[in-house]
A protein has these predicted regions:
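Alpha-helical solenoid scaffolds in large eukaryotic transport, assembly, and signaling factors
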Residues: 2-136
Length: 140
């Protein structure tokens, strides 16, 4: 199955949910194995979900935004997965069009999005990199 075949029978929200759950499960397995890796198993027939979820390839910006929100909701209580989605897909999408940062800020009433913002802000503050970039409250 590929992206368009999946979307012919499933929703963008379902794609995001599956991406989030797969990411969470890989992080948990890597943590249990103490090896730190989160690389998808190339033999997995659904590994395309990981690629599409991570980089949004084949999705419009609006579609990718929906997928990311659903992924965040699917992992709302998992700090590692929330951080990975923030540092990966959310940053990737804003890199495609920086106006989308405003859309993410507008979704901060959603607990999963707010949690991702908190984690990314903590991370960026710890880097002492001179600011939070689009993650900052002043960007909203």
């Amino acid at each position: 199955m590929n992206l368009r075949e999946f979307l012919a029978v499933q929703s963008l929200e379902e794609l995001g949910r599956r991406y989030g759950e797969r990411l969470r499960d890989r992080l948990d397995a890597a943590n249990a194995a103490h090896d730190g890796g989160v690389i998808a198993d190339g033999l997995d027939s659904d590994s395309w979900i990981d690629e599409v979820g991570f980089n949004g390839e084949g999705l419009t910006d609006d579609e990718y935004f929906v997928v990311i929100l659903a992924a965040l909701d699917a992992v709302a209580g998992h700090r590692g997965a929330l951080w990975c989605i923030g540092d990966g897909p959310m940053d990737h999408l804003v890199g495609r069009d920086d106006r989308l940062a405003q859309r993410f800020h507008a979704e901060r009433g959603r607990e999963s999005v707010a949690a991702a913002f908190r984690l990314m802000q903590e991370y960026l503050d710890g880097l002492d990199a001179g600011g939070r970039g689009w993650w900052g409250d002043e960007f909203a």
